[in-house]
C-alpha cells in the first residue's frame, strides 16, 4: 500500500460560520433582513429579526451585549448549531410557520435610549389581546426596509414563498394582508410579459416555426458530424502512418515540457517543417516592416541613441504590430515560428533592457563603458507608461463546464512552471473556482497545491443519490448553496474579498455573474466593480445553473466595520456563462487586456472546434505524397471541399440559432434566454481546447479521485505545451515593460520626494502629476508628431535600397530551393501526376508563401 502524501494546508478549511450564517439569513429572509443590526445600533426603525425562525443562525452573529456567546435555543429549548443549517432546511416551509420575535438582535444602546421603540417592537413581534391581525401586519410592513429584488428568482417546485406561507400554521402576518403588504412580501415581482408575443400571428406561427427550425438544425447537425467523421478517418488512414505516426505518438506521450520540445523538433524535422521558418516571407504578416524595424533598432542600440530608440519602440510596441501576433505564424510548426519573428522579439527585449538600465538617474556614471545618451528619469517613466498602455496586458480566461473545468488545473500548472501565469485571471462557473485558487495563493503556495492530492478538497458532489434527489424535488436544485459555501472556503482562502486577494498575491481576479433578471446587465466582479465582495459568494452565484444551484445573494464586507452584509441590496445572481462565458470586452475595459489565453472546456462548445487552417502548435499536416512532391507547408484540413462544407454547415446552424434568438421563439424556461449559450464569443487570442473522451461525460457531476486528478492535470499540461512559445514571446516584452514601469516610477517618486527612499511596495498604477502628463510629453517624441516621427522612423532611400537587396537575396534562395524541389520531383515515382503539368518558376514562388 502506497504511503499517503499530505496536501499543503490540508487541515485548514478557513470557514467562518458567522459569515456563513449571514449568508443563510440573507438568502432566505431577503425581505426581512436587518441591515441595521450589522452596521450601526442607532437607528430608530427596527425590522423583524429572524432569530426564532431559524435556530442556530443568531448563535454565530456578533452582538454588542455579549449574549450570543452561548448557543441559541429554539422555542422548545433545544440547542441548535449553525453548522446544521442547510439550503434544503431553510427552503422548507416550516420555517415560515414560526412566529417572529425581535428581542435578540437589539443592542444595549438601543434599549437604553429608545425604550418607547422597544415597546412598539414588542407589539409588532408578539400581538397581544386587543390587537388585531391587520394592525400588526400594517405596522410590520411599514417598518421593513425597501430592498431591490430580482424579477425572476425561482422558488422550490412545490410553490413560491407566498404559497407556502398560506398553509395552515402560518403566522398572522402571512394569513391576512392588505393589498399593499401583499405586494411587498414577495421577493419577486410579477413576471413581465413580452409585448411582441401578444401578436396573433406570433401565437399562431411560433411553434410551427420553432419545430421546423429545430428539425432543420437536426438535419444540418447530422451532415456536419458526417463531415467531421470523414476528416478524422481520412487523417487516420492516409496522413498519420508509419514513422510520422510513431513520432506523433512520442510527442503526445511527453511527460515534461523539455521532452515535448525535443520531440516536437524531431517531428518538424521529419516533416521538413523546419524549412518553413527559414524563409521570412509569409502572407499573414508584413515581413518587410519587421525587417526594417529590426535593422533600425540594432543600429540605434549599437550607437547608443536612446531618444531615437524610444521613438521607434513607441511605434512598434502595440497590439499585433505588422501582424506579428497572427496565430498563423505559430500554426505551421509543432514548435517554432519564423526566424525573423524570433529575431524581432529578441531585439525588442534587448532595446527595452538597455533603456531600463540604471545609468541615468540624474548623475553621470563614469564607470559606464558605453556612450549611451542620458535620459531624465521622468522621461523614462512616461515612456514606459505610454508603451504599457499601447501594448496592453495579457489575461487568462477559464471557462465553465461543470467537472470538465478541473482541466484548468493542468493549464495553470503549465503556465506556472514556466513563470508565465498572467496577473489578470477570469473564471466563470467551474472555472471561477480554479481562478479563485490562483488569485488567493502565491506562486510558492500554488506549486504545493496543484498536485493530485488536491482532489481531497473537492467534495462538492459527495452527496449520494438518496440525498440529492429529495432535495431536487423540494428545492428545484441538486446541490445545497450553504453546503457549497463551506466547501469553497478552502479555495478562496476563507472570506477573502477581491481587494484582499489582490493585496495578497498581486493578481486580479474576475468572476462573471448575471442577475436573475434576464434583461439586467452582466457584472464582472473584480477589485474595481466589487472590491469588498466576498469571493466565495460570487463563486456560488457563478455556478447557479438552473437545476444545479438556485440563485444566491452576493455578500460583502462592510468597509467601515468589517461586518458581512448582502451586496447590491440583496439582489440574487446566477451563472455568468449563460450570457458571458469569456468576458473579453469587460477585461479590456477595466484592465486594458488585448491578449487573452482562453481555456475552453464547455462540452457543448468543444464539439464544434475544427481549426481548418490549424491552430497554435498543431499544424495541418499534408499526406505523405504531397509532402514529398513539393514543400507544401499550408493546406486545409481534410482538403478544401471538406473544409468548405464544414464551415458552411456550422455557420448555417449558427444562423438559425440567431433567428430563434432574434424572434424570441425559444421559451424562457426558468426566466432565462437559453439561446445565448451557443451565440457567445468563446475564443481568445490563444484558445486551448482539451480533448474529452466519451467516458469523461460519466463524471461530469462527480468529484475526482486522486488518480483521475493526476490524469486531468497531465491532460491540461499537454494541451498547454504547444501554446507556451507564443505566450513566452508575448510575455517577454510585457514583463520588461512592467519591470521598467515599476522601477522608473519608484525612482521618480524618490526624485519628487527629494531623494528620500520610498517603500519597496509601490503602487505602480498611481498617476503622478496628471496635469503635467496631459500636457507636454516630457521630451518623448509622440507617434503623432509627423515631422519628427518621419525623420526618425520613415523609410529613407537608403532603407528602401537595403530592402531591395534583401528581397533579391530571398529570391535567389527561393530559386535555389525550387531547383532542388524539381530535382526531387523527377526522382519520385509518386509525383508522376504533378509532372504532367507545366508549373512555372514564378507560379511556384508565389504559391510558396501563401496559405492558399
Curated annotation (Swiss-Prot):
Keyword match Metal-binding: no
Pfam families: DUF3336, Patatin
Entry's transmembrane regions: 207-227
Lineage of the organism: Eukaryota, Fungi, Dikarya, Ascomycota, Saccharomycotina
Keyword tRNA processing: no
Database matches in PROSITE patterns: PNPLA (PS51635)
Name of the protein in question: Patatin-like phospholipase domain-containing protein CaO19.1504
GO biological process, one term: lipid catabolic process
Region (Disordered): 41-184, 800-840
Organism: Candida albicans (strain SC5314 / ATCC MYA-2876) (Yeast)
EC number: 3.1.1.-
Subcellular location: Membrane
Biased composition (Acidic residues): 113-122, 805-833
Amino acid at each position: 500500500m502506497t504511503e499517503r502524501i499530505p496536501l499543503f494546508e490540508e487541515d485548514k478549511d478557513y470557514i467562518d460560520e458567522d459569515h456563513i450564517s449571514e449568508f443563510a439569513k440573507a438568502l432566505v429572509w431577503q425581505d426581512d433582513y436587518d441591515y441595521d443590526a450589522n452596521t450601526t445600533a442607532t437607528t430608530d426603525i427596527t425590522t423583524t429579526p429572524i432569530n426564532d425562525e431559524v435556530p442556530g443562525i443568531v448563535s454565530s452573529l456578533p452582538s454588542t451585549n455579549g449574549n450570543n456567546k452561548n448557543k441559541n435555543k429554539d422555542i422548545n429549548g433545544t440547542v441548535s448549531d449553525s453548522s446544521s443549517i442547510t439550503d434544503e432546511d431553510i427552503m422548507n416551509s416550516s420555517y415560515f410557520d414560526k412566529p417572529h420575535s425581535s428581542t435578540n438582535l437589539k443592542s444595549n444602546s438601543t434599549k437604553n435610549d429608545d425604550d418607547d421603540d422597544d415597546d412598539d417592537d414588542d407589539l409588532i413581534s408578539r400581538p397581544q389581546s386587543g390587537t388585531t391581525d391587520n394592525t400588526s401586519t400594517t405596522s410590520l410592513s411599514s417598518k421593513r426596509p425597501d430592498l431591490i429584488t430580482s424579477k425572476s428568482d425561482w422558488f422550490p417546485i412545490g410553490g413560491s414563498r407566498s404559497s407556502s406561507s398560506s398553509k395552515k400554521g402560518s403566522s398572522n402576518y402571512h394569513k391576512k394582508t392588505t393589498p399593499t403588504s401583499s405586494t411587498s412580501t414577495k421577493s419577486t415581482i410579477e413576471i413581465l410579459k413580452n409585448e411582441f408575443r401578444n401578436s396573433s400571428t406570433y401565437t399562431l406561427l411560433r411553434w410551427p416555426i420553432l419545430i421546423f427550425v429545430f428539425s432543420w438544425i437536426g438535419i444540418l447537425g447530422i451532415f456536419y458530424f458526417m463531415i467531421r467523421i470523414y476528416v478524422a478517418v481520412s487523417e487516420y488512414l492516409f496522413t498519420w502512418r508509419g514513422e510520422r505516426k510513431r513520432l506523433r505518438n512520442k510527442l503526445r506521450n511527453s511527460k515534461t515540457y523539455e521532452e515535448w520540445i525535443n520531440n516536437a523538433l524531431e517531428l518538424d524535422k521529419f516533416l521538413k517543417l523546419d524549412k518553413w521558418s527559414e524563409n521570412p516571407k509569409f502572407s499573414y504578416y508584413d515581413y518587410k516592416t519587421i525587417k526594417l524595424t529590426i535593422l533600425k533598432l540594432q543600429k540605434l542600440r549599437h550607437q547608443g541613441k536612446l531618444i531615437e530608440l524610444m521613438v521607434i519602440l513607441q511605434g512598434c510596441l502595440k497590439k499585433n504590430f505588422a501582424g506579428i501576433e497572427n496565430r498563423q505564424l505559430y500554426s505551421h510548426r509543432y514548435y517554432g515560428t519564423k526566424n525573423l519573428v524570433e529575431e524581432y522579439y529578441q531585439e525588442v527585449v534587448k532595446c527595452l533592457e538597455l533603456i531600463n538600465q540604471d545609468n541615468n538617474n540624474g548623475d553621470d556614471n563614469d564607470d559606464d563603458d558605453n556612450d549611451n545618451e542620458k535620459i531624465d528619469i521622468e522621461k523614462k517613466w512616461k515612456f514606459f507608461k505610454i508603451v504599457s498602455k499601447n501594448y496592453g496586458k495579457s489575461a487568462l480566461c477559464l471557462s465553465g463546464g461543470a467537472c470538465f473545468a478541473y482541466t484548468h488545473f493542468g493549464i495553470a500548472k503549465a503556465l506556472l512552471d514556466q513563470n508565465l501565469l498572467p496577473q489578470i485571471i477570469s473564471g466563470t462557473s467551474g472555472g471561477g473556482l480554479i481562478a479563485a485558487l490562483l488569485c488567493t495563493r502565491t506562486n510558492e503556495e500554488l506549486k504545493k497545491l496543484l498536485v493530485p492530492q488536491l482532489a481531497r478538497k473537492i467534495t462538492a458532489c459527495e452527496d449520494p443519490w438518496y440525498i440529492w434527489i429529495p432535495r431536487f424535488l423540494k428545492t428545484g436544485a441538486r446541490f445545497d448553496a450553504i453546503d457549497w459555501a463551506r466547501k469553497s472556503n478552502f479555495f478562496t482562502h476563507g472570506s477573502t474579498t477581491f481587494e484582499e486577494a489582490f493585496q495578497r498575491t498581486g493578481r486580479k481576479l474576475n468572476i462573471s455573474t448575471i442577475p436573475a433578471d434576464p434583461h439586467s446587465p452582466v457584472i464582472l466582479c473584480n477589485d474595481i466593480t466589487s472590491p469588498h465582495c466576498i469571493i466565495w459568494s460570487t463563486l456560488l452565484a457563478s455556478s447557479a445553473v438552473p437545476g444545479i444551484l438556485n440563485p444566491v445573494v452576493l455578500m460583502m464586507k462592510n468597509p467601515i466595520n468589517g461586518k458581512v452584509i448582502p451586496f447590491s441590496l440583496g439582489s440574487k445572481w446566477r451563472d455568468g456563462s449563460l450570457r458571458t462565458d469569456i468576458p473579453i470586452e469587460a477585461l479590456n475595459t477595466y484592465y486594458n487586456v488585448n491578449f487573452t489565453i482562453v481555456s475552453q472546456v464547455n462540452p457543448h462548445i468543444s464539439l464544434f472546434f475544427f481549426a481548418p487552417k490549424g491552430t497554435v502548435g498543431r499544424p495541418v499536416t499534408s499526406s505523405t505524397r504531397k509532402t514529398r512532391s513539393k514543400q507544401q507547408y499550408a493546406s486545409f484540413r481534410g482538403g478544401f471541399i471538406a473544409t468548405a462544407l464544414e464551415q458552411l454547415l456550422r455557420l448555417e446552424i449558427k444562423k438559425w440559432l440567431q433567428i430563434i434568438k432574434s424572434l424570441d421563439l425559444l421559451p424562457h424556461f426558468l426566466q432565462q434566454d437559453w439561446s445565448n449559450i451557443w451565440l457567445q464569443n468563446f475564443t481568445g487570442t490563444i484558445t486551448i481546447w482539451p480533448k474529452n473522451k466519451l467516458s469523461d461525460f460519466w463524471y461530469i457531476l462527480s468529484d475526482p479521485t486522486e488518480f483521475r486528478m493526476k490524469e486531468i492535470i497531465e491532460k491540461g499540461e499537454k494541451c498547454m505545451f504547444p501554446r507556451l512559445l507564443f505566450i513566452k514571446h508575448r510575455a517577454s516584452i510585457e514583463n520588461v515593460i512592467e519591470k521598467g514601469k515599476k522601477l522608473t516610477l519608484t525612482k521618480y517618486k524618490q526624485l519628487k520626494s527629494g531623494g528620500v527612499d520610498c517603500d519597496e511596495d509601490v503602487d505602480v498604477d498611481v498617476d503622478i502629476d496628471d496635469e503635467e502628463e496631459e500636457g507636454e510629453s516630457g521630451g518623448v517624441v509622440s507617434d503623432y508628431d509627423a515631422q519628427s516621427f518621419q525623420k526618425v522612423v520613415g523609410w529613407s532611400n537608403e532603407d528602401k535600397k537595403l530592402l531591395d537587396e534583401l528581397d533579391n537575396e530571398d529570391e535567389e534562395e527561393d530559386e535555389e530551393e525550387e531547383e532542388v524541389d524539381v530535382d526531387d520531383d523527377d526522382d519520385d515515382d509518386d509525383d508522376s501526376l504533378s509532372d504532367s503539368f507545366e508549373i512555372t518558376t514564378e507560379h511556384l514562388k508565389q504559391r510558396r508563401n501563401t496559405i492558399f
